[in-house]
Design a protein with these regions (language model features):
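Dinucleotide-binding Rossmann-like beta1-alpha1 core, especially the glycine-rich loop
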Residues: 6
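C-terminal accessory subdomains/tails of enzymes that are appended
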Residues: 1, 10-14, 20-300
Length: 300
């Protein structure tokens, strides 16, 4: 909507620009940005830039949906981003709305509501107050120590200074787990292919770590989820996918045919997303994107 908030934020070597904040009445599995969405953002961002941006300057595009609590009337940009919790029926607590950045208070409110429901029906006694606001994020405990150790030992692993910063930002104190892998797989210290000189600097060891520690099972899981290679590279991660497939295949026991199927699926996905970005409206974008269902829904 024209009255939506425009964000321009640095994102590593890129800018992150959004949002459109428009209603969506298509499927929920893979919301896709249309040419109209892209044109809208370019038109508005160029109002405040000295040098105009064009489609050719875009490396990646992605779309997502906000679970807004619907009002009786008004534009989506006017609707609240807050969440609401209700005990809709005995034993069933519902949470609606909200956003990623408030996930902890959302969870606390939902659990508190469920506890209140159970206590009100005499099913449980006193429950300690939630401590979630005091619990550090994963990788936060021991961060300073991990930073000192990595900086002191980086040369021993072949990790360059800029990669030290990259790994610490992504993994925090968990970075030691990646260093443990590099002890016996030193060849994985090199960057994943296709990132270019100004790329984010994802290392090959991160692809293996995504499989061994983060549950990655398909190329999509790494190129679009565990990393942002799909939106941070000019080819949407196609070159990176080739290398990721080899690393994953060696760890997961894929044969040549399985690697080929995984790569073909990712290549088809990128082609579908590119077509979606040239569609004039939401329905056309969804029609293009839905040509390639999620790989978990297909036989591999």
């Amino acid at each position: 909507a024209e009255d939506s908030v425009l964000f321009i934020r640095t994102w590593g070597a890129h800018w992150l620009i959004g949002t459109t904040d428009t209603p969506w009445d298509q499927g929920l599995d893979h919301p896709a940005a249309s040419a109209s969405d892209i044109e809208y953002l370019l038109r508005n961002v160029n109002r405040v830039l000295n040098v105009e941006l064009g489609v050719e300057d875009i490396d990646g595009v992605y779309a997502g949906l906000r679970p807004l609590i619907k009002g009786k009337k008004g534009a989506t940009s006017d609707l609240s981003r807050e969440h609401a919790v209700e005990n809709t029926v005995p034993g069933f607590t519902t949470i609606a709305g909200g956003k990623y950045t408030t996930y902890r208070v959302m969870a606390e409110d939902a659990v508190n509501a469920a506890i209140a429901d159970l206590q009100g029906r005499g099913l449980i006694g006193t429950v300690p107050k939630s401590n979630t606001e005091n619990i550090p994020l994963i990788g936060a405990i021991g961060l300073a120590e991990a930073q000192n150790q990595l900086q002191a030992n980086a040369k021993n692993f072949g990790v360059r200074p800029q990669e030290v910063d990259h790994l610490l930002k992504r993994y925090g104190s968990m970075v030691g787990e990646l260093m443990s892998i590099l002890k016996y797989r030193p060849e994985l210290v090199t960057p994943i292919a296709g990132q270019g000189a100004g790329g984010a600097g994802y290392l090959r060891v991160e692809a293996l770590y995504a499989v061994t520690h983060e549950g990655a099972l398909h190329i999509d899981d790494i190129v679009t989820r565990r990393t942002h290679l799909s939106i941070e590279t000019s080819d949407q991660g196609l070159e990176a996918a080739e290398e990721v497939a080899q690393i994953m295949g060696a760890e997961l026991g894929w044969d040549g045919q399985r690697i080929k199927r995984e790569l073909t699926h990712y290549q088809d996905r990128v082609a579908a997303e590119r077509d979606a970005h040239t569609a004039v409206d939401d329905s056309g974008a969804m029609l293009a994107r839905n040509r390639v269902p999620d790989i978990r829904l297909t036989r591999v």
